[in-house]
């Protein structure tokens, strides 16, 4: 039993690209090993609750006659092997989760960079001058949708959903977009310390006021 478990848990998830299915399979294997460990402990419990360390000889040095020595030795051996297997699988699960998380962060960075390049390319192809900010964030509530999206105080807004420098008239434009986008992601482009940042903001009801949890003021143009 333990040799089979060891062979299935061998190998590193980093040998190839890890998928969510791979992680689910590792977790299934971990649970299977835990069930086997529990079953073997139940065998020991059925033998006078002998456990892993109690002696198998009596006070005179003779093999105990009140327990099944073969079952006890086999269960103890299985538990030791399975615990080693469990430790190995837990390490694989940890490595696989780290790899998935790192890959997700890389993909997010690539997507944002690509969106930035597309925006610049679109402006250049249309012969437009660089986008100008039309509003500014001057306060953000902790834990709000705006905070979760990554907005920061003093961010200057270049695009807010369908609102941009060309069509912005008043803050009512932003309010209208927010009201019609509850629960839906909005693409927001801001200028922060001289650099453009692409954010995804989801207007959502939360513990505070409004759907954003931030205050936006218009910029003088």
From Swiss-Prot:
Residues 105-121 have a biased composition (Basic and acidic residues). Residues 108-193 form the PDZ domain. GO terms for cellular component: cytoplasm; nucleus; proteasome regulatory particle, base subcomplex. Keywords: Chaperone. SUPFAM superfamilies: PDZ domain-like. Signal peptide: none annotated. Residues 1-11 have a biased composition (Polar residues). It holds the Pfam family Nas2_N. Residues 1-22, 105-127 are annotated as: Disordered. One of its GO terms (biological process) is proteasome regulatory particle assembly. Acts as a chaperone during the assembly of the 26S proteasome, specifically of the base subcomplex of the PA700/19S regulatory complex (RC). During the base subcomplex assembly is part of an intermediate PSMD9:PSMC6:PSMC3 module, also known as modulator trimer complex; PSMD9 is released during the further base assembly process. Interacts with PSMC3. Part of a transient complex (modulator) containing PSMD9, PSMC6 and PSMC3 formed during the assembly of the 26S proteasome. Belongs to the proteasome subunit p27 family. This is 26S proteasome non-ATPase regulatory subunit 9.
